[in-house]
Curated annotation (Swiss-Prot):
HAMAP family: UPF0215 (MF_00582). This is UPF0215 protein DR_A0167. Belongs to the UPF0215 family. Transmembrane segments: none annotated. It comes from Deinococcus radiodurans (strain ATCC 13939 / DSM 20539 / JCM 16871 / CCUG 27074 / LMG 4051 / NBRC 15346 / NCIMB 9279 / VKM B-1422 / R1).
Amino acid sequence: MPVPVPRAYPRLSHAIGFDDAPFAREWRGDVRIFGAVYAGPTLHAVVSGRVRRDGRNATDELSRLVTAQAEHLQLVFLQGIALAGFNVVDLGALHARTGLPVLVVARRKPRLDRIRRALLEEVPGGARKWRLIEQAGEMEPCAGLYVQRAGLLLAEAEAALGTFCLTGRIPEPLRTAHLIAGGVTRGSSAGQRV
């Protein structure tokens, strides 16, 4: 009797990555966010929107931007679970609204004790935001990075990183969104760490 062959993970070849623009520490208004749409190694589109500094609208705005580009998208990348300070993304809701898996990527494991303290002591609505971070689960090591995920297996996350990490450890859609955000906001992205 033949040995069953495990299901091959589908190759996730079309993705969008989001990053927020730099902002001054004292800034309290909206912060621009940028998304870079990739098909394999090729940049196909750039989108932008706005989220409130330390606000509650990141999930809604990301859902809107992803849905507008969703025809061929297969994956959403985020560099961290929050945009514009502590505007925390509800990963489960973003996955449910867009129908796409969501992969949060970080170079280092976050210091959750410090994040929890800051949220609960200094940020309006911090308890709700902390619950969203807890619901997302622990960050897991994956391909030399740390990830949180909604809607995909760890092996699929590793395969996606293999597909999109072209010029370093950070996936190209995130790297590009980061460079665009810095370039548009500061006039140049030279010298930025990605």
